[in-house]
Structure formats: C-alpha cells, structure tokens
C-alpha cells in the first residue's frame, strides 16, 4: 500500500512543499500538490495548529478522494504571550514575509536577552477520504535575533536563531534545517509511524 501511494500536500506555501517533499522522500509516496487540483482552500479559523491542520487535510482528502497531508505551524514568542502563533502567516495583517518580520521586530524592540526566547511548532495531519486522520507534532526552541541573518528558508527563518546549531534557519540548507526544525521533527515522527506500514488506526485516530 505504501510505496507509490498518492498523497496530496494540502498547502500552497512553496517553502513548506519543498520541505515536505524532502522529508517524505524515504517513503516513496507519489506526492501531489494543490496545483494539481482546482481547489479553493477553506479559511483557517481554528484556535490551534492541530485544528487548522485537521481542517485543511480533511477538506483536501474529501475533495480529491486521496489521502492529504496538511502542515499548520508557527512561531510562538513567550514574552508576547505566544504571538504570532496560529496567526504567523498573517501576523499584523502584513502581506509578505519581510513585512511580517519587520512587524515582529517592532513588537519586540523593547525585549532583550532571555526575553527574546521563542519556539517554532509544527503539526502535520494526514487525513484519509474515509474520515480517518493522524497527527504528528514537532517543536524547536530558539531566540529571535534583533536583525535578520541568512538568505534561505522562508517566513521567520532569518530571525529564528537555534543556539544548538549556532545559526538561524535561513543560514541552513534544507538537510541541516530538517535536523533541527519543528517540521523536520514532525516528519520524522510520521516516518517512524509508517516505517513498517500504516500504524494501527485505533492508536492513531484523531477524535
């Protein structure tokens, strides 16, 4: 059932698509994207990453008749009460990654040292057309720099410094970023679950 299984990546974010394809490569699945279908995605109205990922994955699975994998992820700055959180992609109503980074730096201009600690969280939901769904999560701790560093990645990557690596996500290649990142950890949890075939449904079912 596994090798060659068709799975739709339920995201229009090119950066996420790149990282998901790289991370899922060992499974040998045939990965399709939203560009292969004429779909209008639902609004993300969930209060949590899990709710949003489930909403997207279940919608695409039902619409296409194929398993769908959605990623909902974001940055949580502790001193800002967890902002931007589920609003990471539309923080402050800003339209571009650069504008959102500038807005975040402005919100944090009074914060120093330990006050700049943050974490990235990712929740992957794999939903099937029959209604079954599974969730895989990952997170990584870091610090928000006072100015961007690096040219790679997307989103808040130029600001998110990983002390363990001594770099921002934007200073890492895909492979190195996957070793440390929230999305990489969630993907490894999924790979582990599927290494011997699909996990038992009674264990992995999302209620």
Swiss-Prot record:
<keyword id="KW-0546">Nucleotide metabolism</keyword>
<feature type="binding site">
    <location>
        <position position="72"/>
    </location>
    <ligand>
        <name>Mg(2+)</name>
    </ligand>
</feature>
<dbReference type="InterPro" id="IPR002637">
    <property type="entry name" value="RdgB/HAM1"/>
</dbReference>
<feature type="binding site">
    <location>
        <begin position="11"/>
        <end position="16"/>
    </location>
    <ligand>
        <name>substrate</name>
    </ligand>
</feature>
<feature type="binding site">
    <location>
        <begin position="154"/>
        <end position="157"/>
    </location>
    <ligand>
        <name>substrate</name>
    </ligand>
</feature>
<dbReference type="GO" id="GO:0036222">
    <property type="term" value="F:XTP diphosphatase activity"/>
</dbReference>
<comment type="function">
    <text>Pyrophosphatase that catalyzes the hydrolysis of nucleoside triphosphates to their monophosphate derivatives, with a high preference for the non-canonical purine nucleotides XTP (xanthosine triphosphate), dITP (deoxyinosine triphosphate) and ITP. Seems to function as a house-cleaning enzyme that removes non-canonical purine nucleotides from the nucleotide pool, thus preventing their incorporation into DNA/RNA and avoiding chromosomal lesions.</text>
</comment>
<keyword id="KW-0547">Nucleotide-binding</keyword>
<dbReference type="GO" id="GO:0009117">
    <property type="term" value="P:nucleotide metabolic process"/>
</dbReference>
<protein>
    <recommendedName>
        <fullName>dITP/XTP pyrophosphatase</fullName>
        <ecNumber>3.6.1.66</ecNumber>
    </recommendedName>
</protein>
<dbReference type="GO" id="GO:0017111">
    <property type="term" value="F:ribonucleoside triphosphate phosphatase activity"/>
</dbReference>
<dbReference type="Pfam" id="PF01725">
    <property type="entry name" value="Ham1p_like"/>
</dbReference>
<keyword id="KW-0460">Magnesium</keyword>
<dbReference type="GO" id="GO:0000166">
    <property type="term" value="F:nucleotide binding"/>
</dbReference>
<dbReference type="InterPro" id="IPR020922">
    <property type="entry name" value="dITP/XTP_pyrophosphatase"/>
</dbReference>
<dbReference type="GO" id="GO:0035870">
    <property type="term" value="F:dITP diphosphatase activity"/>
</dbReference>
<feature type="active site" description="Proton acceptor">
    <location>
        <position position="72"/>
    </location>
</feature>
<keyword id="KW-0479">Metal-binding</keyword>
<keyword id="KW-0378">Hydrolase</keyword>
<feature type="binding site">
    <location>
        <begin position="182"/>
        <end position="183"/>
    </location>
    <ligand>
        <name>substrate</name>
    </ligand>
</feature>
<feature type="binding site">
    <location>
        <position position="177"/>
    </location>
    <ligand>
        <name>substrate</name>
    </ligand>
</feature>
<dbReference type="GO" id="GO:0046872">
    <property type="term" value="F:metal ion binding"/>
</dbReference>
<comment type="similarity">
    <text>Belongs to the HAM1 NTPase family.</text>
</comment>
<dbReference type="InterPro" id="IPR029001">
    <property type="entry name" value="ITPase-like_fam"/>
</dbReference>
<feature type="binding site">
    <location>
        <position position="73"/>
    </location>
    <ligand>
        <name>substrate</name>
    </ligand>
</feature>
<dbReference type="GO" id="GO:0036220">
    <property type="term" value="F:ITP diphosphatase activity"/>
</dbReference>
<dbReference type="GO" id="GO:0005829">
    <property type="term" value="C:cytosol"/>
</dbReference>
<comment type="subunit">
    <text>Homodimer.</text>
</comment>
<dbReference type="GO" id="GO:0009146">
    <property type="term" value="P:purine nucleoside triphosphate catabolic process"/>
</dbReference>
